[in-house]
UniProtKB/Swiss-Prot annotation:
InterPro entries: AhpC/TSA, MeN_DH_accessory, Thioredoxin-like_sf, Thioredoxin_domain, Thioredoxin_ResA/DsbE_sf. Disulfide bonds: none annotated. May be specifically involved in the processing, transport, and/or maturation of the MADH beta-subunit. It is found in: Membrane. Keywords: Membrane, Transmembrane, Transmembrane helix. GO terms for biological process: methylamine metabolic process. The chain crosses the membrane at residues 4-24. GO terms for molecular function: antioxidant activity; oxidoreductase activity. It is a single-pass membrane protein. It comes from the Bacteria. Gene3D superfamilies: Glutaredoxin. One of its GO terms (cellular component) is membrane. This is Methylamine utilization protein MauD.
Length: 200
């Protein structure tokens, strides 16, 4: 009986040591993955005007008939965030209050640009308070910027120059557009790549 207890105790300790080795290996792998994965900003997925180019210029009416100017110098020199969305896009719907709060907090103009049937836009606007934002229905603007996926953001400086752009599915993606402009890099990915080169 005693030899059975000794053998089971030895087996238990061997199993414990095995689990410990496996856990240490897993912790190391998680650490390596964490180190390799950098923050992801808004991904540039279009083939439209490049960062540093002048944005295409438009004079369009918003959904309510008021004139909206896209591109070119802004009268007060403020930045403009163009958000390409759709009333049927669930991610756009979720981002709407975030876009509104970032626009207000950063003091930038926000122009929501969409296309589709007027009834869809009316339903969307009936359930969302625009505040200072403008809402434009224009397939032409989306084609000029060659937007293929939504929600897509384009940040213009006060002179109408594209400073940052990319697919914006989260608050972090939206904030990365502003951060890319502040740091002078075209995208967060470009910024992280330059940091890796400096570290090497």
């Amino acid at each position: 009986m005693t030899s059975f207890l000794i053998a089971s105790n030895i087996l238990l300790w061997l199993a414990f040591l095995g689990v410990t080795v496996v856990m240490l290996g897993l912790m190391r792998q998680v650490g390596l993955l964490h180190e390799r994965s950098s923050p992801m900003g808004a991904m540039i997925t279009d083939h439209g005007p490049d960062i540093g180019d002048a944005a295409p210029e438009f004079e369009l009416p918003d959904f309510f008939g008021r004139p909206v100017r896209i591109g070119g110098a802004e009268a007060q020199g403020r930045q403009t965030l163009l958000m390409f969305t759709a009333p049927s896009c669930p991610v756009c719907d979720k981002l709407f209050p975030i876009i509104k709060s970032i626009g207000r907090a950063e003091g930038i103009n926000v122009v929501m640009i969409s296309d589709g049937a007027p009834e869809e836009h009316r339903r969307f606007l009936d359930s969302h308070e625009l505040g200072e934002m403008r809402y434009v229905v224009s397939a032409e603007a989306g084609m000029a910027f060659q937007v293929g996926k939504i929600p897509y953001g384009v940040l213009l400086d006060g002179q109408g120059i594209i400073r940052a752009k990319g697919l914006t599915n989260t608050r972090e993606h939206l904030e990365s557009l502003l951060e890319a402009d502040r740091t002078g890099f075209a995208s967060l990915q470009q910024y992280m790549a330059s940091r890796k080169k400096q570290a090497a």
